[in-house]
């Protein structure tokens, strides 16, 4: 009966939590849909190629590779066997003098047309206002950003030109890595301490530990981050012989430490609310102390324990500054927990825009 009642409370809490999370996700997606209305190429600019070039469209990743000179031949893009020649507006002075361009670049449209027409392998990134109606080349299609480019993209570089990279996969992967290991560290240790304080420790020990643990929950996250930076990061670098200690493991440990006070406090309070009569009845039936804890106290307290775990882990997963300080802030897809990474909350904090002065 106790187990059924406890499980019923858990299912109710899980249902309410799931609905809340679903509503948050729907709201965030509604706000983020504006991203998919944006074009791949930076607003106000176009990509122009020679008229003889058969290439009509490039993805954001291909554009980045071209301008980073990782792709150097049009053959790799389905075009002719010709070298890719990148042209930006600032390069125009290498082709024409200031007199030929005009004092205010009024002759720049004609000059850009001549450059594109005279170079078979050129790809020009220029403002759209410099493209005339009788432009001798052709413009690459500028499609809207697709879902695949966002959720399956492997690069996050929103300030890249000419095509910003909005690959969300590194951030999702980094968040999952850090969250999973934080839960793995915090959950068993937190529940063990809660059981000790509730069922094993004497009054004097409990009265000392409880305020100390509650005090830890009030420490600012930046202090935890600084502690991780000067203690945990060098320790990980030394133990695992790594080039840098700012890794996902450091972030997981810091987040686990931050989650522990909430998990311990709420779980311990839930266990202490178990009626004394239930404990004594279990012992009277011949159960040992540990059997009573496992079979009676924990099942009765499972709803409170679940709340403590959700609150503690929720705070850890949503943490920004502490994670930003110890994980290396690298927007790459990690293959192990011993590599630098970046989480979604840390990215939000790191890339907030500045208000105009």
Regions found by a protein language model. Name each.
Residues 33-36, 148-166, 224-258, 327-328:
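Membrane-interfacial helix termini and adjacent extracytoplasmic/periplasmic loops
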Residues 39-152:
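Flexible loop/hinge segments at secondary-structure junctions
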Residues 16, 166-195:
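Transmembrane alpha-helix signature in integral membrane proteins
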Residues 189-228, 266:
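Cytoplasmic-entry segments and transmembrane alpha-helices of multi-pass inner-membrane transporters
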Residues 266, 275, 289-325:
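Transmembrane alpha-helices
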